[in-house]
């Protein structure tokens, strides 16, 4: 199983992986993802780390708490899916760029 592995380069590989991971984390903070629900009545934005950075709610929803909650949940779930997909893509790029995959 480990016959062809050069363990002397393992430390170097791990150092490169950590450096690349740090770069990707900084890139993620700069990225912004947005999702809308209710035909644009609710818009939620998150950065690449998955932190919600903005929420916009149309004034017409302020009197309808239940609809607002449903639309907020939908928009938050959608934007989190975008962030998660981006994280998977970045992880794949990290490993493929190092020749691990």
Curated annotation (Swiss-Prot):
Homodimer. GO terms for cellular component: bacterial nucleoid; cytosol. One of its GO terms (molecular function) is DNA binding. Binds to DNA and alters its conformation. May be involved in regulation of gene expression, nucleoid organization and DNA protection. This is Nucleoid-associated protein Cla_0113. It comes from the Bacteria. Belongs to the YbaB/EbfC family. The keyword Cytoplasm applies. Its main location: cytoplasm. Keywords: Cytoplasm, DNA-binding. The lineage of its organism: Bacteria, Pseudomonadati, Campylobacterota, Epsilonproteobacteria, Campylobacterales. It is found in: Cytoplasm, Nucleoid.
């Amino acid at each position: 199983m480990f016959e062809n592995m050069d363990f002397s380069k393992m430390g170097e590989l791990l150092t490169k992986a950590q450096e690349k991971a740090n770069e990707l984390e900084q890139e993620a903070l700069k990225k912004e993802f947005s999702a809308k629900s209710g035909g644009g009545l609710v818009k939620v934005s998150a950065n690449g780390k998955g932190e919600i950075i903005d929420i916009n709610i149309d004034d017409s929803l302020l009197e309808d708490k239940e609809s607002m909650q449903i639309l907020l949940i939908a928009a938050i779930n959608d934007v989190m899916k975008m962030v998660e997909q981006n994280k998977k893509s970045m992880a794949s790029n990290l490993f493929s760029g190092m020749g691990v995959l």
